Amino acid sequence: MHSIKRPNRHRFLYFVRHGQYERSPEHPDGTLTELGRLQAETLATRIQDLPLDAIWASTMYRAQETAQIIADRHFPHLEVQRSVLLREKAFPCEHDAWVKALSRHRAPEDRLERIAARWFRRSNRERHELVVCHGNLIRAVVTRVLGSDVNSWLRMSTHHCGLTRVTCWDDGRVSLVTYNDVSYLPDEYISVV
């Protein structure tokens, strides 16, 4: 007797930090630098064979710009969807001041719960979703997936266009598959700040 194979209803999430950016008076959220565009184009080539069902982006311009480059290059059939949940809200200050103040900040736990409810939920079919957002948010999500102290994200680093893969199994388990993969980037394309 043959058993009936159940359909795969796993959700595969690909979290990506936006490309390198710079701020200006015209774009306080930041726009991609030439290097940031190269990082996004290289990432697009790296993931071109994924059967993506959706591309999500933070409402901040640098994340939208990164997501649009990826969509335009290899996924023109997908419209980039935006979510305010993916915004980098916890640390709006300049980087140097942020580094000095790290010990005073806490990850936004209530927002992590809303993100988990939205993206870690079970699917009625196999789904592959790209989520272009921010390093702080990705690190906080990883701590939640691992069940570690929410403030352990302060000891992690996320590179521009680093790829973090999370699998949400149909039985409710969530697993970290890779964190901050930049192995596809040439050394001269790797950046953090």
Show which residues each predicted segment covers.
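A conserved mid-domain beta-alpha-beta active-site/ligand-binding segment of alpha/beta enzyme cores
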Residues: I115
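Alpha-helix N-cap/helix-start capping motif
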Residues: M60-Q64, G135-N136, H160
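Active-site-proximal alpha-helix that buttresses catalytic centers in soluble enzyme cores
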Residues: I4-R82, H105
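GST superfamily/GST-like fold recognition
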Residues: G135-R139, S175
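Active-site signature of alpha/beta-hydrolase-fold catalytic machinery across serine-
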Residues: I69, A140, R144
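Acidic, low-complexity terminal tails and accessory targeting/binding regions
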Residues: M1-R11, P76, Q81, F91-S103, ...
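Active-site metal-binding loops of divalent metal-dependent hydrolases
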Residues: G19, G135, V182
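Generic beta-sheet signal
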Residues: L13, R125-N136
